[in-house]
Regions:
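GST superfamily/GST-like fold recognition
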Residues: 130-144
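GST-like domain detector, emphasizing the conserved glutathione-binding G-site
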Residues: 1-112, 119
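Surface-exposed helix-capping loop/turn segments at secondary-structure junctions
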Residues: 120-131
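Alpha-helix C-caps/helix-loop-beta hinges
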Residues: 37, 124-125, 141
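Alpha-helical scaffold segments in carbohydrate-active enzymes
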Residues: 81, 117, 142-144
Length: 144
């Protein structure tokens, strides 16, 4: 979702293909051996297979509302917190039967610790970095 939002925002034309993860086409593995989505094949033949990297690439082409113009380092740090920690705990919470090492409540509390960080950033403003939307807002939003 977040990669598509950045591509749309940047007004980049691309061919969108929905993939059933239980029936992944061979072409997906040819482009990216990981077999994960999203995958963006550039006109040059280069492939970007991480959503955050697709977002950064799209905004490097066209960033009309300057989502990634200010607070770049802080935005990257917040997105890394989301991608490296929050997503991990969220998956363990959602699929807790696969992770019996801890009770469900433990995973929930780990998620809440990170949500508290987000909440603190938003307590006196509409977006993570002020009055206007940023790349970090778009990158984190699909997971909340």
């Amino acid at each position: 979702m977040r990669a598509r939002m950045a591509l749309y925002h940047s007004k980049i034309n691309y061919e969108h293909r929905e993939i059933l993860l239980r029936n992944r086409p061979e072409k997906l593995y040819q482009l990216s051996p990981k077999g994960t989505v999203p995958v963006l094949e550039l006109p040059s033949g280069d492939v970007i297979d991480e959503s955050f990297d697709i977002m950064k690439w799209a905004l490097s082409i066209n960033d009309p509302e300057m989502w990634f113009d200010k607070h770049k380092e802080e935005q990257v740090d917040l997105i890394k917190l989301n991608d490296d920690k929050f997503k991990k705990w969220l998956d363990k919470y959602k699929y807790h039967v696969r992770f019996p090492e801890y009770p469900l409540e433990y995973y929930r509390k780990e998620c809440e610790k990170i949500l508290d960080i987000y909440e603190d950033r938003l307590k006196d403003k509409s977006f993570f970095f002020g009055a206007t939307i940023s790349l970090a807002d778009i990158a984190v939003m699909p997971f909340i």
